[in-house]
């Protein structure tokens, strides 16, 4: 249920916040064993938070902006006193000693924490199949994946097991599962939201953002979690506009760029292409000006990303050695042996694969050939975006080349799964804001996502365009 629907129930006193929260936990108990979107729930704490909001309502006090909204948190974001595992054996049982800035802002705004959601181990994946806690199912078809790495967050929203969820996006990990699950997923500008308390995968790419039922809900959450944070030196010290107030503006004469290279890629599914092009026509009918633009290096993004991201991951994950915290092997005969075995046993196959790729790319004799060249291509991709934004206000692409695939489809060919990020990674490489919104369905009844990309700190433009599209299209009127 979206925020506005919940607020109506609360304000008209058709239900107390405590009753609504209890109802959600009953639904989690009945539905989540099949979906497996949650790693753990925080019912006692959520009930206490709900009772506090009910007291404010009873006393007719001013309510914080997200008062009573039930929200789930991806389990690579620290929540004080609650398990933060990154869905890995390496951190299984680890309890965070502090609260992330983003989640702390949510609770200060009145949001209620329901629990921690499943993900690909250490956020490395596109299917939520690599979690030590088991595979998450897509609520639209439980034989299929929800996408990744924020698959648990997207699945929980789509299945009505929370009103909204927080995820992280390194190469598409919010937008791709949002597309697969038929919900809204927003990756803000790099630095718009503090990364303090986000377990690092690739520090120059990671960004926290919302997964919601509606664009307006995403706008509300973004406003609540954005802003300068002295604990994160990469967090931007820029004013945060009220994104919700800026919705509903006319998009007449808005210049939308259609990236030519995206629609010509041989890996793009025909049904996805046709659905997104129908979305383009809808924007045109709403008054937007459609302009074809070229980003010659857009399709080089995937190769660039899979050099830079593993390189940063190999450095970030070096801290997990079994000494101060995390999994420790009992079989090591000395410190070096213990560290080696702890990492071999604690990390799954995909995490080990990416660590090895990154270590190789950074190694002496290969850094110039791979990592430094990838950084040069990254700059060229950013330059392509700069040129495009001189002609248009926002850019439009499909979110993913395909709809949700079957579980196990890429078990024997994990590298092919990397192509799921084909259309999402360029925005991360350039640090740009991007949003995925539902635009239709394929013949199997699976959701298709449309992606809008904005210039730096221009979330308001993509949110407004997405909101106008959402109202006009009414793609998903009733949630599962």
Swiss-Prot record:
Q: What name appears for this protein in its UniProt entry? A: Glutamyl-tRNA(Gln) amidotransferase subunit A
The protein's superkingdom reads Bacteria
Q: What EC number(s) does its UniProt record assign?
A: 6.3.5.7
One family name in Pfam for this protein: Amidase
Its family remark reads: Belongs to the amidase family. GatA subfamily.
The cross-references to InterPro entries, in alphabetical order and at most eight, read: Amidase, Amidase_CS, Amidase_dom, AS_sf, GatA
Q: How does it assemble?
A: Heterotrimer of A, B and C subunits.
Q: What class of enzyme is it?
A: ligase
Example of a GO MF term: ATP binding
């Amino acid at each position: 249920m979206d925020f506005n629907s919940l607020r109506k129930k609360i304000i008209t006193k058709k239900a107390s916040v405590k009753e609504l929260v209890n109802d959600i936990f009953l639904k989690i108990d009945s539905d989540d064993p099949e979906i497996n979107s949650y790693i753990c729930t925080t019912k006692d704490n959520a009930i206490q938070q709900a009772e506090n909001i009910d007291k404010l309502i009873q006393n007719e006090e001013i309510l914080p902006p997200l008062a009573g909204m039930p929200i789930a948190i991806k389990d690579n974001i620290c929540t004080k006193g609650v398990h933060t595992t990154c869905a890995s054996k390496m951190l299984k049982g680890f309890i965070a000693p502090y609260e992330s800035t983003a989640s702390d802002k949510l609770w200060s705004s009145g949001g209620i924490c329901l629990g921690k959601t499943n993900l690909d181990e250490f956020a490395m994946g596109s299917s939520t199949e690599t979690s030590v806690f088991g595979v998450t199912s897509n609520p639209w078809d439980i034989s299929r994946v929800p996408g990744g790495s924020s698959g648990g967050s997207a699945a929980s929203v789509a299945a009505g097991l929370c009103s909204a969820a927080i995820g992280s996006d390194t190469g598409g990990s919010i937008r791709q599962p949002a597309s697969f699950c038929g919900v809204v997923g927003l990756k803000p500008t790099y630095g718009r939201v503090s990364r303090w308390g986000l377990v690092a995968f690739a520090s120059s790419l990671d960004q926290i953002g919302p997964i919601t039922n509606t664009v307006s809900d995403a706008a509300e959450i973004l406003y609540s979690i954005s802003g300068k944070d002295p604990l994160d030196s990469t967090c931007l010290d820029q004013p945060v506009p009220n994104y919700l107030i800026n919705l509903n503006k006319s998009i007449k004469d808005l210049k939308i760029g259609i990236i030519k290279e995206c629609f010509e890629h041989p890996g793009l599914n025909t049904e996805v292409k046709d659905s997104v092009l129908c979305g383009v026509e809808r924007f045109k009918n709403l008054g937007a000006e459609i302009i074809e633009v070229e980003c010659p290096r857009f399709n080089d993004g995937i190769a660039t990303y899979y050099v830079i991201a593993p390189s940063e991951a190999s450095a970030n994950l070096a801290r997990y050695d079994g000494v101060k915290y995390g999994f420790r092997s009992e079989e090591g005969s000395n410190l070096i042996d213990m560290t080696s075995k702890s990492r071999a046993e604690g990390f799954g196959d995909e995490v080990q694969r990416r660590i090895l790729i990154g270590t190789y790319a950074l190694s002496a004799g290969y850094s110039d050939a791979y990592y430094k060249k990838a950084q040069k291509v990254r700059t060229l991709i950013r330059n392509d975006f700069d040129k495009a934004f001189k002609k248009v206000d926002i850019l439009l692409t499909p979110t993913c080349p395909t709809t949700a695939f079957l579980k196990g489809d890429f078990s024997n060919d994990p590298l092919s799964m990397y192509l799921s990020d084909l259309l999402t990674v360029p925005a991360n490489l350039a640090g740009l804001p991007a949003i995925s919104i539902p635009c239709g369905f394929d013949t199997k009844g699976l959701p298709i996502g449309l992606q809008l990309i904005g210039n730096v700190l221009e979330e308001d433009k993509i949110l407004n365009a997405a909101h106008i599209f959402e109202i006009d299209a009414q793609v998903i009127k009733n949630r599962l």
